[in-house]
């Protein structure tokens, strides 16, 4: 592990880490209890769980080989209580079967791009740093952001920007990208920032932060198929929970939080018609919500960790088993 990586791990403050542990800990008290950290990153959340829940072991999933290497070194002192797994988190059911016999006591998702990826100028995630337009969370597989910008037609670019970036100037930006690539390909983040700045009216650039923020978010989500992966992962994670197990999800924009809210609410609501005098067992809720709406970072957390500003945390507990539901077709992003 390089010195810069070691420094990054030491400085990285996981968001709402203690709150996550407090929510998960009641399910991790028995010997051999298993937590799946589905978004391992630099291992900050897992480290706190392993320190405060001495009977638990952690399966740490990440699609980024560099993050796995970094977290494995950080958590080496816990020995066999920590197992790194190179996978995408919609493979959580397979990971649970292979490493925990199918049922786990806790699942944690800390969604979005990690500090490691944001702070590495060479990955192309940050609009404030010039770098090749890559944006892949796993840099060993799949098309890059530059590939997407070169291959997608104007309508598809418009859809990506509007859907994943909630960008109201999506038509103007998509048209500008197509015009620019006819002259020269967009290969670097500075190329894309220049196009976005030229497409958005100056009056709109004076508010709302960096004008390319939403475009970069949209491309990152599209390149990594983040919402598709999350939509598959959430029901699989819930199905992998043993009764009494807990799931905690931290999301960082409304698109993620909407999916999380919907999936947890579905599990916490009866599926029976309202007029039935008795709710059949198979229609009874299988989750109990542990948070009232989405929790946010308080002033103390924000002062220590500004990246917590957009976090929305939701949690639930598995209260009964559910009939086996059909598994959506898996497609590796």
Swiss-Prot record:
GO terms for biological process: rRNA base methylation. The keyword Transport does not apply. InterPro entries: RsmH, SAM-dep_MeTrfase_MraW_recog, SAM-dependent_MTases_sf. The gene is rsmH. Its main location: cytoplasm. Its EC number is 2.1.1.199. It catalyses: cytidine(1402) in 16S rRNA + S-adenosyl-L-methionine = N(4)-methylcytidine(1402) in 16S rRNA + S-adenosyl-L-homocysteine + H(+). Keywords: Cytoplasm, Methyltransferase, rRNA processing, S-adenosyl-L-methionine, Transferase. The keyword 4Fe-4S does not apply. It is found in: Cytoplasm. Pfam families: Methyltransf_5. One of its GO terms (molecular function) is rRNA (cytosine-N4-)-methyltransferase activity. Belongs to the methyltransferase superfamily. RsmH family. One of its GO terms (cellular component) is cytoplasm. This is Ribosomal RNA small subunit methyltransferase H. Specifically methylates the N4 position of cytidine in position 1402 (C1402) of 16S rRNA. Residues 312-333 are annotated as: Disordered. S-adenosyl-L-methionine binds at residues 43-45, 62, 89, 110, 117.
């Amino acid at each position: 592990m390089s010195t810069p990586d070691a420094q990054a791990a030491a400085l990285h403050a996981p968001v709402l880490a203690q709150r996550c542990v407090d929510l998960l800990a009641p399910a991790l008290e028995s010997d051999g209890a298993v937590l799946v950290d589905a978004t391992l990153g630099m291992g900050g959340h897992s480290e706190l769980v392993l320190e405060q829940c001495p009977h638990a072991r952690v399966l740490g999933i990440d699609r980024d080989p560099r993050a796995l290497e970094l977290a494995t070194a950080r958590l080496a002192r816990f020995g066999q209580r920590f197992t790194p797994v190179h996978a995408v988190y919609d493979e959580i059911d397979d990971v649970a079967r292979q490493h925990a016999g199918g049922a786990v006591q806790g699942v944690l998702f800390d969604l979005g791009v990690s500090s490691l990826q944001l702070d590495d100028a060479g990955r192309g995630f940050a609009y404030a740093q010039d770098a090749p337009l890559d944006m892949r969370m796993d840099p060993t597989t799949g098309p890059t952001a530059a590939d997407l910008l070169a291959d997608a037609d104007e309508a598809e670019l418009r859809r990506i920007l509007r859907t994943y970036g909630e960008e109201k100037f999506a038509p103007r930006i998509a048209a500008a990208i197509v015009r620019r690539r006819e002259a020269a390909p967009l290969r670097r983040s500075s190329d894309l920032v220049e196009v976005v700045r030229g497409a958005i009216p100056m009056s709109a650039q004076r508010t709302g932060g960096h004008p390319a923020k939403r475009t970069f978010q949209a491309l990152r989500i599209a390149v990594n198929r983040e919402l598709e992966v999350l939509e598959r992962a959430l029901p699989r994670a819930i199905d992998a929970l043993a009764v009494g197990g807990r799931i905690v999800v931290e999301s960082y924009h409304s698109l993620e939080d909407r999916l999380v809210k919907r999936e947890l609410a579905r599990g916490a609501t009866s599926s029976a018609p309202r007029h039935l005098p008795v709710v059949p067992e198979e229609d009874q809720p299988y989750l109990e919500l542990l948070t009232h709406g989405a929790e946010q970072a308080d002033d103390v957390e924000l002062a220590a960790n500004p990246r917590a500003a957009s976090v929305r945390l939701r949690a639930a507990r598995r209260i009964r088993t559910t009939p086996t539901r059909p598994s959506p077709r898996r497609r590796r992003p």
